[in-house]
Amino acid sequence: MQKNKSILSWLVISVCFLIFISSVIFFVQNKGNETTENLNVTLTDVGFDTPITLNCSCSQADFAKYTKIIRKTFKENNKRFDQYHAYKNMNNLYTLNHEAYNHPIQMDETFIDCLKLAMQMQSENSQFDISQGALLNLWHEARENTQIPPSDDKIQEALNHIDLDKIQISGHEVSYLDPKLSIDLGAIAKGYTAQLAKEALNKAGLTNGYINAGGNVVLLGEKEDGTNWKIGIQSPDASDALVQYSTKKATCLVTSGDYQRYFTYKNKKYSHIIDPKTGYPANYVRSVTVITKDSGKADA
């Protein structure tokens, strides 16, 4: 009887010891996962024709969560603002441009919010015009396919269908009053999406690091070590020459210029930045960088 008690006691002690060892191993492994380190990922499959980079200091587990937020936000909005493709069970910009003259189209809250922001920015700057989709389509075709500028007649015809007042919003419904009117949100959609991603990451607990969305740099908070952020802005005259901007605060920088996307015809460069007043590429300045707190507004 005494011998059986001794065996039972040793079994209990052994089980307790194994539980203790397992707990220590689990704690050490998870402690390692919580170690803060500088992490970086570049996503090339989330749309907007550009790589999206996230850099921050956090644990591996949190970084996986933050990367998921970036991926989800950009992929969803790439579909939402896509003017070239339709998607199943979704009204997007393609749907709007092909059907909004025939009947009002029900759009989701995010699309309406971006559309209203674009209209607000247009009321403050007439050179920014989302209703110039027909004109931009001409230049997109020239840049991506023919490498020949569109004719003056085609440009004039497209100019006749630029009119923000012919876009009507009622609640979540959008309709067009011109069958040839077309919206293009390319000048604001990526910046707007980067701003949404920033807000989602901040809400999830990330308050340091940055998002780089091809010309759109969004600082998520102050640097972990307390020093200033240093952002290089490319010179339009040399790909390896940079102008440095330094700041400690969370802010957004958006740069666009005639050196980024263009084609050359008969020794003349035609950039992707089109003036909605003339119908031709703008040639006022080579490059512009806007610094502000809101990436969507900076993009516009």
Give names to the regions the model predicted.
Residues Q2-A300:
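Mature catalytic core of soluble alpha/beta enzymes
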